Amino acid sequence: MSGNSFGRAFVLTSFGESHGAAIGGIIDGCPARIAIDSKEIQKELDRRKPARSAYVSSRREADEIHLFSGIFEGQTTGTPIGFVIQNCDQRSDDYAPFKAQFRPSHADYTYQKKYGIRDYRGGGRASARETAVRVTGGAIAKAVLQQLCAIKVRAYLSQIGCHRLAFESWQAVSSNPFSCPNQHQLSVIAQYLEDIQRRGNSVGTEITVVAEQVPAGLGEPVFDRLDADIAKALMSINAVKAVAIGDGFTSANQYGSMFRDERTARDGFLSNHAGGILGGISSGQTIVASAVFKPTSSIPIPAKSVDQNGDDCIISVRGRHDPCVGLRAVPIVEAMVSLTLCDHLLRQRGQNGQR
């Protein structure tokens, strides 16, 4: 198993490299007669693509989606959905110095050890360029979730560096390039990122994702728990180093009398510390999860490393890189949670019918 496919009932298989001719994917298991609007898929891709602001990579990719199978007259046919996205703005010469050198905290060294060969141009398969495929698959999964159960998956930037961002409204999230949940901290974020860029450094982030209208009963105990699969989905995204469900790591500071989500016949659940999942199965509450993205190591500040011969070297990474990879990660996080929920929804219906 090569690890390029995700899901069991709704399966996305991804292919392509950062500086190859194209990237793309195949979706197998999508139900028939799901309305698909290619413009809506393109909107999702436009949210992820580079060069959207001064604070992300200046690589200019149109990210135009080409759907070539599985959709007829605007509806899915139940057969595999194939799509491809051309790579048009590669600058492979920027990576020539790293043909024989390993960039710190990148996949260069581990890919070389695993395969004995690696595509050093833009990180090859390990590049975040691959996530455009996930966003495409996630857009189709969103259509399935919306049309079958009215499930809505949205995410926002909840922390950047030392700045915790208070949630104000979804309208605020969609009205700025940072996916910041409130208008009051926008100038602080902008100034903070400018300072980071000026110093030639980078910074980490946290993205919070919320899934509403998820029916109770999704999840397969014990090894395919819904929260376990969400964690796997989010951890599979480039640069993610931690995942939390519900209150997550802050649960360690709480008492059972506080954390337990009590409920009454009249009001239902009185809290949602568990993040909408109990015993690995959705409870019918809103599902809440978060993913922490490390600061990218593609920065001009010199760093110690070694080359393929095992000799010491000094590396300074220049070119078109994100000072904060989390800024473009919001639609990717949404996509992976949507893929997970879609997979579990179809598995639940296949096993237990529509309840």
Swiss-Prot record:
Pathway(s): Metabolic intermediate biosynthesis; chorismate biosynthesis; chorismate from D-erythrose 4-phosphate and phosphoenolpyruvate: step 7/7
Entry-linked SUPFAM superfamilies: Chorismate synthase, AroC (SSF103263)
GO molecular function, a single term: FMN binding
Coiled-coil intervals, chain numbering: none
GO BP annotation list: amino acid biosynthetic process; aromatic amino acid family biosynthetic process; chorismate biosynthetic process
Pfam families: Chorismate_synt
Catalytic activities: 5-O-(1-carboxyvinyl)-3-phosphoshikimate = chorismate + phosphate
Residues binding NADP(+): R48
Binding site for FMN: R125, A126, S127, N238, A239, G279, K294, P295, T296, S297, S298, R320
Key words of the record: Amino-acid biosynthesis, Aromatic amino acid biosynthesis, FAD, Flavoprotein, FMN, Lyase, NADP
Entry's EC annotation: 4.2.3.5
Gene3D superfamilies assigned: Chorismate synthase AroC
GO cellular component, one term: cytosol
Listed NCBIfam families: aroC, PRK05382.1
Function description: This reaction introduces a second double bond into the aromatic ring system.
Matching PANTHER family: CHORISMATE SYNTHASE (PTHR21085:SF0)
Family: Belongs to the chorismate synthase family.
Protein name per Swiss-Prot or TrEMBL: Chorismate synthase
Species per Swiss-Prot/TrEMBL record: Dichelobacter nodosus (strain VCS1703A)
